[in-house]
Amino acid sequence: MLLAKVVGTLVSTRKEQTLENLKFLVLKQIDTDQKETGAYVIAADAVGAGVGEIVLYATGSSARQTVMTDRRPCDAVVMAIVDLWEIDEELKFHKYGHA
């Protein structure tokens, strides 16, 4: 799994039938210091994440192992909304800004 910040949404009115009713998010991969590290990623949203939230996402075959993405042509899926993380017993991120 990888860390990312949700930076936008993607709307598609015409798509492959198995992708109907999926919400898509635009993600930017980040490191544990919240610095952007990669390209943009389009991911199906399995958890109801919103713009500005930090999330965990998976790609490849792992992305197709959620109930929502099973048997669907998804290459990336948001699997969790991050509340906080600690490294070496130091709080590095808190969703509500306490870090």
Where do the PLM segments sit?
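A generic local secondary-structure boundary/capping motif
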Residues: R14-E16, A44-A46, T66-T69
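N-terminal first-folded block
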Residues: M1-T37
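Short alpha-helix capping/helix-loop boundary micro-motifs
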Residues: A39-A43
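A structural micro-motif recognizing beta-strand termini
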Residues: I30, A44-A46, G60, V82
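C-terminal structural segments of small proteins and small subunits
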Residues: S62-A99
